[in-house]
């Protein structure tokens, strides 16, 4: 057994000295337990650390995976001889776990035959899959303008309070329930309350037995928040590689992974780079993102919420994330202020598969038509603000009227937000979405007031509302 001693504790970073020639490699897990000590400890200690740096003179610097309260210099530290390993496979389904794969749902231990280290190489290039297929979400604005790639990576970008988590919850509700496959949810540095709500919602919906939930919330040390995404990903990889499944991986929030990396980096004494972020930002992000991929055996489709500090998309954290994604859904505060939810910016959001060869000519033309009308409306807004609507040409007046209808038709009531909106959620198939927007662009509904388009599901619902409005008049 390889045993070292604590020589220094700085917050969540612990320096440990080992005997010459017995220094553990980077990423190895170390344990500090009360029962291993020569003298009894005041509080029971069961702490896991991960080696992050070799300092020379047989010393390593390790990052703690829980609170370092009660540690004193001279304590014995045991090298486990391997990286942090977590249980994977069928016994983990339906469980709520922490970064070390330990259950936190009070349902007893996880009995699994398979354990994987959380640090694993990405699949080699020749094993990666290149097929392109659309993943239907039932959310109109996403299916039309930002179609999701099956087995791809999707990012939801937005500042504080514009609805990232609500969209993630709705996607879990729509895709995980329809999908029937396995879903993994990694809660990285977000609110414990949201995790609790999600757990109970999944339980009530009866999809918990096909879901794994891994949490490292806001109150956890940065080491946990930095590694909990890898724990969730490792569990998803098992089902992709060993069982050939199509797995859904939800990460809320990937920015907290970067933020935790920045905290750890400062504690390790690295020189900060732009805006105070860690110099290894792109490397850390790449190591995580390159593992989230589809192979010939199975796929991982990931949906990642990305917090945008101060609504600045050029901040290094969201900017680094952009490079890895197939679809970027940008949530806009201006659209949220209009009361249009989901507050997706139809002109700023992009998808790699909005291509006539993949989604079809009709879908492509309708999507581009919607964007054209909304772009023209955006250009005309300054003129309207200064001179008023009367100064516009008849053609522009028609564009403005249609754009306002399109804008409202892009809103949709969500099942997970029923308690707040009082409206039942709507799932709209892609075909219905395309038909609805095509009819608005063709001018078939120019006579319907724009209020009828707000928070509607299909175009038939809009027409029905207009009839009711006429009847009551």
Swiss-Prot record:
Gene name of this polypeptide: atpD
Report the source organism.
Carboxydothermus hydrogenoformans (strain ATCC BAA-161 / DSM 6008 / Z-2901)
EC annotation?
Answer: 7.1.2.2
Q: Which PANTHER family did the record assign?
A: ATP SYNTHASE (PTHR15184), ATP SYNTHASE SUBUNIT BETA, MITOCHONDRIAL (PTHR15184:SF71)
User: What is the enzyme's class at the highest EC level?
Assistant: translocase
Per the similarity annotation, which family is this?
A: Belongs to the ATPase alpha/beta chains family.
Keyword presence, Nucleotide-binding: yes
Write the protein's name: ATP synthase subunit beta
Q: Which annotated residues bind ATP?
A: 158-165
Q: Which CDD domains match?
A: ATP-synt_F1_beta_C (cd18110), ATP-synt_F1_beta_N (cd18115), F1-ATPase_beta_CD (cd01133)
Q: How does it assemble?
A: F-type ATPases have 2 components, CF(1) - the catalytic core - and CF(0) - the membrane proton channel. CF(1) has five subunits: alpha(3), beta(3), gamma(1), delta(1), epsilon(1). CF(0) has three main subunits: a(1), b(2) and c(9-12). The alpha and beta chains form an alternating ring which encloses part of the gamma chain. CF(1) is attached to CF(0) by a central stalk formed by the gamma and epsilon chains, while a peripheral stalk is formed by the delta and b chains.
Q: Which GO terms describe its molecular function?
A: ATP binding; ATP hydrolysis activity; proton-transporting ATP synthase activity, rotational mechanism
What does it catalyze?
Answer: ATP + H2O + 4 H(+)(in) = ADP + phosphate + 5 H(+)(out)
Q: Which SUPFAM superfamilies match?
A: C-terminal domain of alpha and beta subunits of F1 ATP synthase (SSF47917), N-terminal domain of alpha and beta subunits of F1 ATP synthase (SSF50615), P-loop containing nucleoside triphosphate hydrolases (SSF52540)
One of the record's GO cellular component terms:
plasma membrane
Q: What does this protein do?
A: Produces ATP from ADP in the presence of a proton gradient across the membrane. The catalytic sites are hosted primarily by the beta subunits.
Keyword ATP-binding found: yes
Q: Which HAMAP family match?
A: ATP_synth_beta_bact
- Record keywords, A-Z: ATP synthesis, ATP-binding, Cell membrane, CF(1), Hydrogen ion transport, Ion transport, Membrane, Nucleotide-binding, Translocase, Transport
Cellular localization per UniProt: Cell membrane
Stated membrane topology is:
Peripheral membrane protein
Using the UniProt record, give the first listed, main subcellular location.
membrane
């Amino acid at each position: 057994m390889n045993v070292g001693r604590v020589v220094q504790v700085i917050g969540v970073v612990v320096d440990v000295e080992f005997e010459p020639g017995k220094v553990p490699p980077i990423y190895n897990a170390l344990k500090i337990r009360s029962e291993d000590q020569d003298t009894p400890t005041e509080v029971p200690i069961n702490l896991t650390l991960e080696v992050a740096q070799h300092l020379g003179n047989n010393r390593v610097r390790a990052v703690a995976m829980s609170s370092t309260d009660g540690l004193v210099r001279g304590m014995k530290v045991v090298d486990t001889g391997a990286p942090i390993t977590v249980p994977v496979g069928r016994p983990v389904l339906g469980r709520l776990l922490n970064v070390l794969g330990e259950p936190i749902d009070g349902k007893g231990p996880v009995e699994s035959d398979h354990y994987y280290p959380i640090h694993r190489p990405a699949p080699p290039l020749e094993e990666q899959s290149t097929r392109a297929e659309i993943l239907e979400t039932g959310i109109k604005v996403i299916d039309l303008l930002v179609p999701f790639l099956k087995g791809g990576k999707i990012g939801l970008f937005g500042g504080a309070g514009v609805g990232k988590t609500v969209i993630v919850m709705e996607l879990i509700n729509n895709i995980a329930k329809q999908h029937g496959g396995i879903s993994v949810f990694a809660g990285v540095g977000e609110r414990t309350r949201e995790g609790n709500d999600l757990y109970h919602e999944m339980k009530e919906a009866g999809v918990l037995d096909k879901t794994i939930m891994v949490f490292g919330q806001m109150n956890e040390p940065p080491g946990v928040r930095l590694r909990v995404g890898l724990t969730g990903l490792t569990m998803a990889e098992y089902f992709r590689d060993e069982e050939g499944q199509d797995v859904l991986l939800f990460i809320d929030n990937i920015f907290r992974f970067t933020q935790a990396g920045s905290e750890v980096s400062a504690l390790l004494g690295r020189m900060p780079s732009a805006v105070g972020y860690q110099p290894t930002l792109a490397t850390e992000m790449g190591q995580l993102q390159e593992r989230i991929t589809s192979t010939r055996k199975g796929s991982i489709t990931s949906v990642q919420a990305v917090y945008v500090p101060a609504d600045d998309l050029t901040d290094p954290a969201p900017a680094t994330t952009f490079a890895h994604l197939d679809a970027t859904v940008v949530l806009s505060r201006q659209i949220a202020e209009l009361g249009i939810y989901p507050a997706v910016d139809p002109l700023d959001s992009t998808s790699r598969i909005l291509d006539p060869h993949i989604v079809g000519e009709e879908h492509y033309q309708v999507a581009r038509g919607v964007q054209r009308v909304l772009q023209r409306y955006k250009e005309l807004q300054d003129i309207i603000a200064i001179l008023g609507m009367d100064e516009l040409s008849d053609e522009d007046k028609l564009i403005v009227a249609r754009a306002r209808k399109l804008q409202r038709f892009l809103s949709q009531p969500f099942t997970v937000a029923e308690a707040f909106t009082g409206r039942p959620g709507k799932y709209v198939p892609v075909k219905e979405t395309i038909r609805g927007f095509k009819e608005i662009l063709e001018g078939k509904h120019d006579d319907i007031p724009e209020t009828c388009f707000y928070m509607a599901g299909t175009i038939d619902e809009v027409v029905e509302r207009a009839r009711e409005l006429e009847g009551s008049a």
